[in-house]
Amino acid sequence: MPCSLETRSPQGLSANIQDLAFHGSIAVQPLALTASSLVTCLGAGREANASALRTRRTGLAPCAFETVTLDTCVGEVRGVDDVRVPDRLRNFDCRNNRMAQLGLEIDGFSNAVIAARDRYGPGRIGVFLGTSTSGILETELGYRKRDAEGRLPPDFHYRETHNTYSLADYVRHAFELSGPAVVVSAACASSAKVFGSAARAIAVGLCDAAVVGGVDSLCLTALYGFHSLGLLSPHPCRPFDAARDGISISEGAGFVLLEKPQHAASPARVHLLGVG
């Protein structure tokens, strides 16, 4: 999990934000989070999510996703099917990349990345994203349309949808970036680990800024897989309740833009001080 790390001088005084923090064995400068976006079942945008948390409103509801007939609650993001990817990226069209597009468009995040691209150059911005199942739903849907020989339909594009890397590939094409692009798929730790990957890349000079975050979308594999393990709750999950009885599967997207503080267009209120 990401965690802050405060550095101190030999005299015990707190160091300022420009002092070094440590990531593994690499000393790096703290990185500024200059833009961010968030889409969950609570709503689209940071404010919608904050409002739901303040009013204790849940986004979990009885599952009505696709053909699923499980007695469980899910956190489905409304409106994903209405999102349209750019025409030039139509081969990437799948629920996971539409979820990504929704996250890129909200909270002014897209404008911030474009401004950074203009400032640093497209080859100096990296993309470091986490996902667990990527666009596997597209394969699940395509499987229903196999021909007599078992072939998937001709409009199915594995590389741009189901392939785990398709998420980073979609985002880099969406912003026309040519810096390093990485996807980490390590279950629930995926979106935490990419902060470390981005910090390392900036520290060693591979890029000057990075789009960092994660996207996951509902799919039959995750729902039926966790059901087969007996882990799904029939109610909205209550992880800290003595009577807790399982988990609830959800979906969403979250992005941040990481930059060195001295190069950011404006001062940031939040900084990444370390990962461990």
Short names for language-model regions:
Residues 110, 164-168, 172-214, 249-266:
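Active-site-proximal alpha-helical scaffold in enzymes
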Residues 206-228, 233-244, 275:
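Acyl-CoA/ACP chain-elongation machinery
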Residues 67, 99-103, 157-165, 182-190, ...:
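Active-site nucleophile and cofactor-binding loops and adjacent substrate-binding regions
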Residues 30-34, 46, 52-74, 236-276:
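Condensing-enzyme catalytic core mediating Claisen C-C bond formation in acyl metabolism
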Residues 131-182:
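Active-site-proximal gating segment of KS-fold condensing enzymes and close homologs
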Residues 47-51, 140-152, 171, 201-204, ...:
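A glycine- and small-aliphatic-rich helix-loop capping segment at beta-alpha/alpha-beta transitions
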